[in-house]
């Protein structure tokens, strides 16, 4: 994974191979080392060996860098929902798709944790967070709407979308704070409880599964 995009000869503009992903890697490193507020677009561009103009070809602001992967997740959600067979129950489909889209390689987890910690701790990112979470929620609501034959902005699809988002944000927060289990286990436990209407027996079963996973990780 490239972290230095400088090219020789003092060439200005976009070096060969510069991409949104490469700028993202550099920006995340700078955010970690210097803080989000003290890292300017100029600093990111300089570290990448590109101009500010090139940076803005990829991102509208430095905050957008943190949401690059998230936007891809929303697209992946929609694509996965489109492939779900109609006989799969609604909440089972949502649980399956959300957990599947959030399977990360072990080497990508530290970066994901850094990203989520920044999003959760920097006040300046809250407005962009609201916009992105809304797009994620709409992906769920749109799928629910197609299943029940109602407009996406009607009560039931909106309820499904917002409840699912709340459950997943709780799972993300818990995972980010503890680092004791795979993210998918936290998501699966939260969505299983939601699908069961937070029935106490279902919650105990999900909690037991999560606890067993944590115990296995502790001895490996």
Question: For each of these PLM feature ranges, what is it?
Answer:
Residues 1-17, 191, 195-220:
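N-terminal intrinsically disordered/low-complexity leader segments
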Residues 1-34, 38-50, 67, 76, ...:
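Basic, helix-initiating cap at the start of DNA-binding domains
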Residues 50-59:
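Short hydrophobic/aromatic patch on the recognition helix
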Residues 63-73:
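Alpha-helical DNA-contacting segments of helix-turn-helix folds
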Residues 130, 147-193:
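Hydrophobic/aromatic-rich alpha-helical bundle segments in the mid-to-C-terminal region
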Residues 75-117:
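Hydrophobic alpha-helical connector segments
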Residues 107, 122, 134-160:
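Hydrophobic alpha-helical bundle segments that form small-molecule/ligand-binding pockets
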Residues 73, 132-136, 140, 190:
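Hydrophobic/aromatic residues within well-ordered alpha-helical segments
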